[in-house]
A protein has these predicted regions:
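Charge-lined substrate channels and their catalytic hotspots, especially those that engage the 3′ end
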Residues: 2-308, 315-364, 392, 400, ...
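Electropositive polyanion-binding surfaces
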Residues: 53, 205, 211-212, 238, ...
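A short macromolecule-binding patch
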Residues: 117-122, 184-190, 683-700
């Protein structure tokens, strides 16, 4: 066929249509050229004619483009006009790159690695940057040599996310989606044909499509309808979607999991250590379904104990390269909201095939210890096993055994404690196992504390829920001996597995916890001084000892939750990495996560690496595993945020029935816009706005971390006891508003 020259596309004016990508490329080339001229002679100023001459620009269209770019670069604070029409490049040291943290009031703070203080950015200088974005910020000259820097966002380098949760507000031919996140300072403009079936009032997921320079709001498209606000499922799905977390399982992954061979075969048993005859049991929360771990116990002829820590062998079923593994990696963790669990694995695996349910043979990965009566590890064996759990205990049941039973005798768990709501008989050999393990756990814990471990027994807020998932009461979960028994043996297994691989000097996944920042510890010390406490910060040992003494001393006191929270905030965050630095909080030189592969992907990686190295495989690619570690750390952080939001939501919902009621509370936070108060009896936290404190005009004193009345000098500080009235509850924002009561 003969080729013909196609006519060029014509615009409405009849002129050839511009090649947008070419124009964009030409623009970027011109900007680079402008900077090359200005940076070559940084002390001089150049007007557009001089720059044009240096760049050999002679035609009028390109000169016009040059003038336009100079004006835009000046507006973006990339160059400065030192004299009329004369420009200089702004030195790059006046720019910083960091992560934008937007407050609920709409202002932002850019967090820059290496800077002691964040850079404040007023809302009108955010320039379309959103919470969590990686940004470039220009610092205003008058603030450069001060502790408090202020600036303007000059460039969004990377969006944190493009999908947001909000509520549809319909207009005639368009709609706005109002975000649920108070840190989002703009609505989304959505054309009618981009609503995809969403109606007025629907809660939806909206994706940013475009945000034009002169538009106040970004253009969006509705991707998913979550439901009607106020419905429990809608609200929980909204929380998950806000953090980019899934709430359903892809059908193709579920189908893949259902086709797996889940049987226990003789061939596979032959490849494993068979421990089905050894006494084995699980201790878990009352409502648990995913039993990751079990303990086995046997008295040896030499008087020592054989103690097995047996972990669900998830990697036997979840193979690398499958869609099942890909989905598990993407999720990286199970998410535990107040009223539901969003599992990392399909239900057929997490609650059935992998779960170490009683009276079923299971494939496990085990660390088996020989331990003497001093809780010293004499010998260790690590490898794949097959086990059989004979008993399943709730923590309350095991605690009942610890408190009431005697060695050498059987024990009956009372009906009111039993998970069956009936009396349960516990054989004498199981009683002996639990009591002996508890004694050994206490010794293990004592050793850790002497080495400088820190014990955080922060109070966990739990809710009584009715059949519709609505909160009817609040209670606090305590960590007792049964919890600590399991904790100590899981810590032991995690530590010993990490030490075992570390000796090989091969790539591995570690859970590390850096030393706390000295300034944060000093700030924490300053706050607790107001309660009459103090820390000895001379060295690591005195620091950890005094923190432990403090945490023990505040137990049961009104300030306990505040002190516990501030202590945790003063610490670094634990993360996953291939580069081991030890675990400060646990006082371990080596530590990993081996014990929860049903709900944590790093544990799956640990199992795989461990088996490879047991089979004498070479070290695996470090860069690949470091990337997976970072992803896992990020996903666990997002999951923790979602879990906190679900608690806040339930607290607000619970307090709806208590509007206008008065409660005693403790000031848990102080800001320039008000004080946060935590109600003592239920740990619900709300805001008393500074403008609502009518007896004076209050301003924030940063040095004393207090709101101070300008006329009276009256102060509101962290830890002060106050009486409040519940003024308002906002379920959408998950916020409580309080007012002070005289």
């Amino acid at each position: 066929m003969k080729k013909t020259n196609k006519p060029k596309k014509q615009g409405k004016s009849g002129k050839p249509k511009k090649n947008k990508s070419l124009a964009k490329r030409n623009k970027h080339e011109l900007i680079k050229a402008i900077f090359s001229v200005l940076q070559e002679h940084p002390e001089e100023g150049f007007n557009y004619k001089q720059i044009a001459a240096k760049l050999h620009i002679t035609d009028a269209p390109r000169r016009d483009m040059l003038v336009k770019q100079l004006v835009q670069l000046k507006e973006k604070k990339r160059i400065v006009e030192i004299d009329r029409g004369k420009y200089q490049a702004i030195p790059m040291q006046h720019y910083y790159v960091g992560t934008l943290d937007v407050s609920s009031r709409g202002n932002g703070y850019v967090i820059v690695d290496g800077l002691d203080n964040d850079i404040f950015v007023a809302q009108n200088f955010l320039n379309k940057a959103l919470h969590g974005d990686l940004v470039e910020v220009y610092v205003f000259p008058r603030f450069r040599n001060r502790n408090k820097m202020e600036g303007e966002i000059s460039k969004v380098l990377e969006r944190n996310k493009v999908r947001f949760v909000g509520t549809v507000q319909m207009h005639k031919n368009f709609a706005f989606v109002v975000p649920t996140d108070a840190r989002m300072y703009t609505d989304f403009f959505v054309l009618k044909d981009k609503l995809n079936g969403a109606q007025d009032g629907d809660r939806v997921i909206v994706r940013i499509e475009d945000w034009k320079d002169k538009s106040d709001s970004p253009m969006g498209v509705v991707e998913q309808i979550l439901g009607k606000p106020g419905e429990q499922t809608t609200e929980m799905h909204s929380i998950l979607a806000e953090y980019g977390l899934p709430y359903t399982y892809p059908e193709e992954v579920e189908a893949f999991a259902k086709k797996l061979d889940l049987s226990i075969t003789d061939e596979e048993i032959a490849r494993r250590r068979d421990m089905r005859e050894t006494l084995t049991f699980t201790i878990d929360p009352r409502d648990a379904k995913d039993f990751d771990d079990a303990l086995s116990f046997k008295v040896l002829e030499n008087g020592n104990y054989e103690i097995g820590v047996h972990i669900a062998d998830v990697s036997h079923y979840v193979k690398e390269g499958t869609i099942l593994d890909e989905e598990a990696y993407n999720r990286a963790t199970s998410v535990y909201l107040v009223d539901r669990v969003v599992p990392m694995l399909p239900e057929i695996l997490c609650n059935f095939a992998c779960s170490l349910r009683p009276d079923e043979d299971k494939y496990t990965f085990s660390a088996v210890f020989e331990m003497n009566k001093k809780a010293e590890v004499v010998d260790i064996w690590i490898g794949r096993t097959v086990t059989h759990s004979s008993f399943r205990f709730a923590y309350e049941e095991a605690q009942s055994v610890i408190e009431q039973a005697k060695v050498g005798e059987g024990y009956t768990i009372p009906a009111e404690t039993s998970i069956t709501d009936k009396e349960r008989a516990v054989p004498a050999e199981v009683v002996e196992a639990i009591l002996t393990l508890n004694t050994l756990a206490e010794k293990l814990r004592g050793k850790r504390m002497r080495l400088g471990a820190i014990t955080f027994d922060k109070v966990e807020v739990k809710f009584d829920l009715d059949e519709n998932g609505n909160p009817t009461g609040v209670y606090f979960k305590e960590s007792k001996e049964a919890n600590k028994l399991i904790e100590e043996f899981m810590l032991l297994a995690n530590r010993k597995v990490a030490e075992y691989v570390a000796k090989m000097k091969k790539t591995f996944v570690y859970c590390v916890h850096d030393e706390p920042d000295a300034d944060k510890l000093q700030q924490f010390n300053t706050v607790i001084n107001r309660f009459g406490y103090s820390l000895d910060l001379k060295n690591r040992q005195t620091t950890t000892d005094s923190i432990n003494n403090l945490l023990e001393e505040v137990k049961g006191k009104k300030e306990q939750n505040l002190v516990d929270t501030l202590a945790i905030r003063s610490m670094a965050k634990a993360t996953y990495t291939t580069k081991n630095i030890g675990h400060y909080g646990l006082a371990f030189d080596y530590y990993t996560h081996f014990t929860s592969p049903i709900r944590r992907y790093p544990d799956v990686m640990v199992h795989r690496l461990l088996q490879l190295y047991l089979d004498n495989a070479p070290s695996q690619p470090e860069a690949e595993y470091e990337t997976k570690c970072k992803h896992s750390s990020q996903m666990e952080s997002l999951a923790a945020s979602a879990e906190r939001d679900s608690i806040k939501y339930m607290q607000v919902k619970y307090m709806e029935a208590h509007k206008n009621q008065q409660f005693a509370g403790v000031i848990s936070g102080v800001t320039e816009w008000g004080i946060y108060v935590e109600i003592t009896v239920n740990k619900c936290e709300g805001l008393v706005r500074a403008r609502d404190i009518k007896d004076d005009y209050y301003t924030f004193d940063e040095q004393q971390y207090a709101l101070v009345g300008q006329a009276t000098g009256k102060m509101y500080q962290l830890g002060d006891e106050v009486m409040i009235r519940v003024k308002n509850t906002d379920l959408m924002k998950k916020q409580l508003d309080f007012e002070l009561v005289d």
